[in-house]
Amino acid sequence: MARGFTVGFDPLGLGELSSGSLSSVSSRGHLGSDSGSTATRYLLRKQQRLLNGPSRGIRASSPMGRVILINSPIEANSDESDIIHAVRVEKSPSGRLGFSVRGGSEHGLGIFVSKVEEGSSAERAGLCVGDKITEVNGLSLESTTMGSAVRLLTSSSCLHMMVRRMGRVPGIKFSKEKTTWVDVVNRRLVVEKCSSTPSDRSSEDGVRRIVHLYTTSDDFCLGFNIRGGKEFGLGIYVSKVDHGGLAEENGIKVGDQVLAANGVRFDDISHSQAVEVLKGQTHIMLTIKETGRYPAYKEMVSEYCWLDRLSNGVLQQLSPASESSSSVSSYASSAPCSSGSLPSDRMDVCLGPEEPTSHGPGWGRADTAMQTEPDLDSRVETWCSVRPTVILRDTAIRSDGPSSTRHLDSALSESPKTALLLALSRPRTPITRSQSHLTLWEEKKQRKKEKSGSSGEKGALQRSKTLMNLFFKGGRQGRPAGDGHREAWTLDSRSPTKVRPRLDLEKAGSVGPVQKFVTWRLRRDRERGRALLSARSGSPSGQAPTVNEQVQAWESRRPLIQDLARRLLTDDEVLAVTRHCSRYVHEGGVEDLVRPLLAILDRPTKLLLLRDIRSVVAPTDLGRFDSMVMPVELEAFEALKSRAVGPSALRPTRQDTPPKRHLITPVPDSRGGFYLLPVNSSEDEDGEIREKLGVLKVSLGASAPHHKGIPPLQDVPVDAFSLRRGACAPPPQPPPVAPRPPRPNWLLTEPLSREDTQQNQSQTPAQSCSRSRSRSRSRSHSRGQGKSPGRRRSPSPAPIATAATANGRYHRPRKARPLLPRLLDGQVAKVGARQGPLENGRIAEEAVGNVSTGALRTITLSKMKQSLGISISGGIESKVQPMVKIEKIFPGGAAFLCGDLQAGFELVAVDGESLEQVTHQRAVDTIRRAYRNKAREPMELVVRVPGPGLLPLASDLRVVKDQSLAPDCPSALGPVDDARILTQLPPPEARQLQQSLSSALKVPQSIPKLSPILKDPHDPS
């Protein structure tokens, strides 16, 4: 004992312990000495436990002396867990860490390193299989789930980890359901480690006998309780015997097993069927076997074991002697359990990754095959309950009514096992019969009968009020009872104004939920009755309120009800509600009040008025009023609740707002419906959704059950998260299906080129300002608030057309429209401008309706993608763009993968339903409904491709300027197009349009190239 020892402890891992220091530092612990220092090591550990307290688990003593280990740590007896190392792991250039982890708080474990790749950065840093990661970058991983640990490990490129060199990896294996039995002889709990019952193992040991029980139909009471059944995998056992009952007189004891009853075998029968057999006849012949125990509860437990790391890195299950021996058994400390009566029968479960062949043969063998041979030694494995404890039903066979099934009181603060032990330690109390709660009037009546001493009434059964009487008679104060008194209200002799309920349930001992509900209902009715009786100074009796009192109460509540009604209803509806309430107060009839109110209050928000109207209803009519109104109020509450948490509804576009843009992306919500994603959140949510899906994939893989209801352990590769997260940024671009034509509205979004910049520098400041203002308005699609550039007086003979004239409608100069790429519409508006505002609008509408602006084309696309992926704009309510057009196509959607749809196409029809002359909201709903209908595949879109009647774009004008409009050079609008356009217009207008087109092609150098060139109407020539 006097021999010295040294302590080798390296918390930061700064120094490695050499193999030559084995004399001072043990290979399996932080204490080092020779073989004679066992007592010293034991004393030091005991002193450390006294100073620091229980470090890995809390041991609590039960009332019967049983020791329970809480938190079930599986590394409780491991000496290597105190060796702490600091490891610094950096990601490789490819972004890999090179190790996998296992465990998590969802399994009651820490985070363990289960695999380390050869040549990886983790192996070079010194990370080993079997290390328990306790800290990462200053954050503790104790009591951390696997998902949180993986997110923390992949969040940084450099990991500073504190690990415990355990040298082993936790495995998991599952046992069958364990049944806890109550030993009647020794009054203790015995845990059975296999699914077979003691009667099955020792069927010949018990003494069998036949018992005859005779009862009558009037007084059917066998006097015992049964427990068990086929649904629990057990037989039928006697769990309780009434003191002095029929069963006790015939020798039936607690712990006897019922093998048969009247020829019906009970070895394979459910609990409810056994109750029916025992309560079916007056003469019952029971076959009884003495077992001395009955089942208490069942639970599913999981047993953890260790996988040891060999010298070559392969995991192998430890021997029984080296496994953890932390006791979590619920055996009593004095419960003898021989190996012959309770053999160990465990079930082998294969655990491992989803693809065992992806690793080497050693890994696949170690993770998927764990040999769990039954062992009869004194080995107690670490286990924890993974399912809630099932308390077996206990049914009393003693009455002709419904079977009274009782459970243990779940309100106790102790666990079910401790509650059972406390119940076993208490002395047995004889069975006493108690009647239901009686009213005060019935108690007085019963005392009068007892005082009268009538022999004929003493033996009769006194029945108390039933639940039906309490609900439908006790709650109505105006109905008289049998002797003429009011049943629900009575007067206190000491206080004439104090009204108290008849049902004084608090004095009757234990109060159940039904009695509490009845008491609460009576108190509520009493408070409402007092509110109606508050106008009176005092009353000698507790009668129902009169008509005058109801009128006074209505007049006091009328301003509040009318104020709330004006907020929710129209003026006519407010008058109607007031009229019906006044009629009810003066004439009565709750049905005549409820029916018109429900017809008026046809919206969920309007039904909120019923809460205030309920205060006007008389207490005698509240039951009928609630029965008629309550279902409607519940539906309204559900509707308001779903509306509060649901997506915001799309409202129709106003007349003074620009066209709306909506991303047609039907995404299912939690209620099975669909809603649209915002336009600006598609790219942001794409990465978030992929990241969430990645996390879900790992969590689902980690919790994929290999056994019913049991989550097994799996290795989670850390690099899979980092690689998946890095791959989410650039979405793959599919190859183009066909060469796409230039976008029709690219003039609005194309930046200025070098030639444009040079030209802007050479022009006058007024011209540059005019061009910049027109471009800014075209890009933002907003209405002009100041003066339009097209209305400025210019020395050139041709003014600049605005969106007001380009769309064929006449507006004042201060309300100019942004530019639209339509030369033909501008010419028609120019022609009609000479005939006045009214004729201008009519002629422009006729021209736009007659002239075809593009060819129709049918495009089909698949509905297999989750999102259609387009943004639309326009609608019949918009003056700028009455047609529905595709504003933008988003990558990844069905429209993008189709390859035929382009931004600027006009949508004519979707799946046979027309989109012409419809509102913006109607178009959104139509497209969403068509894409959601997966029965019609594929989706057919009829679009109008923009024709050649567009404005010359920037590139076209630049070509015209460079070539100086050579006479032999064909223009953007060829002769064929001019002839086609002119044949569709009236002859006078065609001639004017032809002159305008010919003059428009002669573009002077001083005119801005981005504006259409028209003939000046003020030119005298």
UniProtKB/Swiss-Prot annotation:
Pfam families tied to this protein: PDZ
Biological source species? Mus musculus (Mouse)
Renumbered to this chain, region (Disordered) spans: 324-345, 431-495, 724-814, 992-1021
Relate the assembly described in the record.
Answer: Homodimerizes (via PDZ2 domain). Component of USH2 complex, composed of ADGRV1, PDZD7, USH2A and WHRN. Interacts (via PDZ domains) with WHRN; the interaction is direct. Interacts with USH1G. Interacts with ADGRV1 (via the cytoplasmic region). Interacts with USH2A (via the cytoplasmic region). Interacts with MYO7A (via MyTH4-FERM domains).
Where is this gene product found? Cell projection, Cilium; Nucleus; Cell projection, Stereocilium
Record keywords, A-Z: Cell projection, Cilium, Nucleus, Repeat
- Give the protein's recorded name: PDZ domain-containing protein 7
- Composition bias of kind Low complexity appears in 324-344, 799-808
Function text: In cochlear developing hair cells, essential in organizing the USH2 complex at stereocilia ankle links. Blocks inhibition of adenylate cyclase activity mediated by ADGRV1.
What PANTHER family does the record tag this protein with? Answer: PDZ DOMAIN CONTAINING WHIRLIN AND HARMONIN-RELATED, PDZ DOMAIN-CONTAINING PROTEIN 7
What's in the GO CC field?
ciliary basal body; nucleoplasm; stereocilia ankle link; stereocilia ankle link complex; stereocilium; USH2 complex
From which domain of life does this come?
Answer: Eukaryota
Q: Which InterPro entries match?
A: PDZ, PDZ_sf, PDZD7_HN-like, USH2_Complex_Protein
* PDZ domain residues: 86-156, 210-279, 858-930
Q: Which ranges are annotated Polar residues under compositional bias?
A: 758-767
Residue ranges annotated as compositionally biased, kind Pro residues, are 729-744
